[in-house]
Amino acid sequence: MATKSTGGTEKTKSIEVKKKLINVLIVDDDPLNRRLHEMIIKTIGGISQTAKNGEEAVILHRDGEASFDLILMDKEMPERDGVSTTKKLREMKVTSMIVGVTSVADQEEERKAFMEAGLNHCLEKPLTKAKIFPLISHLFDA
């Protein structure tokens, strides 16, 4: 089931969006990736919630539980992959920034399909603070 983590008190610059901490949904079937992504978001002062697959992400939004500034979306997942999840969320009028996180970001056809589904940006694994911090700062003009 989905889990929630709040930002810590690390002495790093926090990313704020409109005077509030950035709220991130991490969608990934790999528990190690989810934990790594949670730790990265925490180190930049954000808060996060996780979903282990795309279906959980859709249910969170359908049930009205969701209000995220950013969704980090894995591409390859069981039950509902990142491309179909992104399409479904956009059909549901979800306006959150969606960033694809994939090991195949360098393959043009894979990246194109993911972007056409409604992504705002795509990052290649492994996700690091050095990759995500500048992107979030740029996307949200933080």
UniProtKB/Swiss-Prot annotation:
Keywords: Cytokinin signaling pathway, Nucleus, Phosphoprotein, Transcription, Transcription regulation, Two-component regulatory system. GO terms for cellular component: cytoplasm; nucleus. The modification 4-aspartylphosphate is found at residue 74. It is found in: Nucleus. Disulfide bonds: none annotated. It holds the Pfam family Response_reg. GO terms for molecular function: phosphorelay response regulator activity; protein histidine phosphatase activity. Functions as a response regulator involved in His-to-Asp phosphorelay signal transduction system. Phosphorylation of the Asp residue in the receiver domain activates the ability of the protein to promote the transcription of target genes. Type-A response regulators seem to act as negative regulators of the cytokinin signaling. This is Two-component response regulator ARR22. It comes from Arabidopsis thaliana. The lineage of its organism: Eukaryota, Viridiplantae, Streptophyta, Embryophyta, Tracheophyta.
